[in-house]
Amino acid sequence: MASTASFMLAVLLAVAVAAAPARAVRCPPSDKQALMRVKQSLGNPATLSTWSLASADCCEWDHVRCDEAGRVNNVFIDGANDVRGQIPSAVAGLTALMSLSLFRLPGLSGPIPACLTALSNLQFLTISHTNVSGVIPDSLARIRSLDSVDLSHNSLTGPIPNSFSDLPNLRSLDLRSNKLTGCIPAGLVQGQFRSLILSYNQLTGPIPRDDAQDEINTVDLSHNRLTGDASFLFAAGRPIGKVDLSWNDLDFDLSKLVFPPELTYLDLSHNRIRGTVPRSLAALSTLQTLDLSYNRLCGPLPRLHGVIRHGCKPYEHNQCAGGAPLGGCHQS
C-alpha cells in the first residue's frame, strides 16, 4: 500500500514538472555577448569591471537592468571618464533594449550610429554631455516606439530631421546646447509633445505655427535666431507651464495675449516684442519667473500686484516705439 502511494506521488510530481512552463533563461548568451562587445569597443573601462564572462548572470552587472523574461532592457552608463571611443555598433545586438542612457561621458565621440534603428523596442534614448558629433541621423525616426529623446550638450550639427515630427509616441525632445542649424520642422511644436527643448543652437526662421489643442507643457527655444510671431503658443486650451523664447529675434504684439493659468515660467527677453503688458499677465497667481526685458514694450504697466510682485527688473530696457515709455513700476 505504501509502495503504491509512493509510486502515485512520484507520477504526480513528474506530471507537474512536465506541465510547468519552462523558466526563462536570465541573460541569454546573445545579450551577454553583445554587452561584452560593447565593453571592448569602449576600451574595457574599469567602470564596466563587473561585465565579465566569469559572471553567469549579466542581469546582476552594474549599469544593466533586465526585464521579467531575463532580457537586458536597460543600459545606463554615466559619469565615467574612462569610457573611450564611439557608440558601439554592438548595442544593436541588445534587441530587447527599452532604455539606453549614455550620460556625462566626455571620452565618447564620433557620430550617432544608424544601427540604433535595430532597437525596435527602444522608448528612452539619452546621449548627453558627450563629444558625440555629426548630424542627427534621419533613420532614428524608424524607431517608432521612442517616447523620449535627449541628445543635449553634444557637438551635433546640421538640421533637425523632419521625420521627428512623424514619431507617433514621442513626448519629449531635448536637443539643447548643440550646433544645430536650419528651421524647426513643421509639426514639431504641436501634437503629443509635452516637452520641447531646442535652446542654445543656431536655428533660424519662424516657429512653425500650429493651432491644435495639445498637451505641450514646456517649450524652450531660447538662444537661437528665430524670427516672426510666437503668440500662437499661448492659444486658449494649451496647458503650457514653461515658455522660454529669450535671445531670439521674435516680433509680435503682446497686448492682447491671454496667458494660460498653468503658466509658471515666462521669459521673452531680448527680442523685438511690442505692445503693452496685458492685464491677463497680472492675474497669473502661479507665475514664479518673469522676464520681458530688452524688448519694445510700451506703457503703462497694469497697476496690479501680480505684475509688480516680480519687481522692476523683468521690464527693464524696453525701447518703446510710437507710444508711452514702459513705466509705472515702483517697488514698495
Curated annotation (Swiss-Prot):
Superkingdom in the source lineage: Eukaryota
GO cellular component, one term: extracellular region
Gene Ontology BP annotations: cell differentiation; specification of floral organ number
LRR repeats: 72-96, 97-118, 119-142, 143-166, 167-192, 193-215, 216-236, 237-259, 260-283, 284-310
Phenotype upon loss of function: Increased numbers of floral organs, including the stamen, carpel, palea/lemma, stigma and lodicule.
Stored Gene3D superfamilies: Ribonuclease Inhibitor
Residues carrying sugar: 131
Protein name in the entry: Polygalacturonase inhibitor 1
Compartmental location: Secreted, Cell wall
Gene transcribed to yield this protein: FOR1
Tissue specificity field: Highly expressed in calli, immature and mature panicles, and in three inner floral organs: lodicules, stamens and carpels. Expressed at low level in seedling roots and mature stems.
Family note: Belongs to the polygalacturonase-inhibiting protein family.
Pfam assignment, any one: LRRNT_2
Keywords of this entry: Cell wall, Differentiation, Disulfide bond, Glycoprotein, Leucine-rich repeat, Repeat, Secreted, Signal
Residues making up the signal peptide according to the UniProt record: 1-24
InterPro entries referenced in this protein's UniProt entry, alphabetically: Leu-rich_rpt, LRR_dom_sf, LRR_N_plant-typ, PGIP
Described function: Inhibitor of fungal polygalacturonase. Regulates floral organ number.
Cysteine pairs bridged by disulfides in the record: 27-58, 59-66, 298-312, 298-320, 320-329
The keyword RNA-binding appears for this protein: no
SUPFAM superfamilies in the cross-refs: L domain-like
Organism: Oryza sativa subsp. japonica (Rice)
GO MF entries: enzyme inhibitor activity
